[in-house]
């Protein structure tokens, strides 16, 4: 099959919907829904792939992101015994042009204020197509909540995530797996030259 060495290739437009001019409509391959923490370098959600969606769709000041994406098919290079092949490798290790049968519907609700607290809510659903063997197909659910507070000295943030049949991505499914992730992180600036960052995290797996 063909291979493509592009991690990102997409188009996006605004000012398409008269009632929602700031809504950003996109389609293609992108680093999708991958919120990352700094100290532990952890993507607590990750749905990179190809698909389409809309971001910043405004309803009464609250903004919504919705997308349907698929996980990109990739190849792990292996040396072949067939010496008639000049390169003697199965592939270059880049991504395929198609998907591997794992799909996700992702949502994010943001620009919510609860007093001084900024609120973000995530809800994702994962499923498989016929490209996956029927006895291996699974569904997965995932919900997330982010509460953050910013002031002149820094920011504090609480992240909560619950996943059913998955961990940080509903692409990658494991039957009867339940995971919970919770963290508290932030930063405090003492002076222009001195700042401290901190993070406390809890990650629980229940594969029962």
Where are these regions (language model features)?
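Internal metal/ion-chelating core segments
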Residues: 64-69, 73-152
């Amino acid at each position: 099959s063909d291979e493509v060495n592009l991690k990102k290739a997409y188009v996006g437009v605004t000012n398409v919907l008269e009632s929602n001019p700031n809504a950003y409509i996109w389609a293609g391959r992108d680093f999708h829904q991958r919120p990352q923490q700094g100290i532990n370098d952890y993507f607590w959600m990750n749905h990179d792939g190809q698909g389409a969606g809309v971001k910043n769709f405004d309803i009464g000041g609250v903004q919504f992101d919705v997308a349907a994406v698929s996980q990109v098919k990739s190849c792990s290079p292996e040396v072949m015994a067939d010496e008639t092949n000049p390169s003697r490798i199965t592939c270059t290790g880049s991504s395929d042009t198609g998907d591997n049968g794992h799909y996700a519907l992702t949502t994010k609700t943001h620009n919510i204020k609860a007093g001084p607290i900024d609120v973000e809510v995530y809800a994702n659903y994962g499923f498989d197509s016929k490209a996956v063997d029927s006895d291996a197909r699974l569904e997965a659910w995932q919900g997330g909540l982010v509460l953050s507070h910013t002031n002149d000295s820094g920011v504090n943030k609480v992240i909560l995530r619950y996943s059913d049949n998955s961990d940080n991505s509903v692409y990658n499914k494991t039957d009867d797996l339940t995971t919970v992730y919770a963290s508290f992180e932030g930063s405090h600036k003492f002076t222009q030259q001195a700042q401290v960052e901190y993070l406390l995290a809890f990650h629980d797996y229940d594969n029962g």
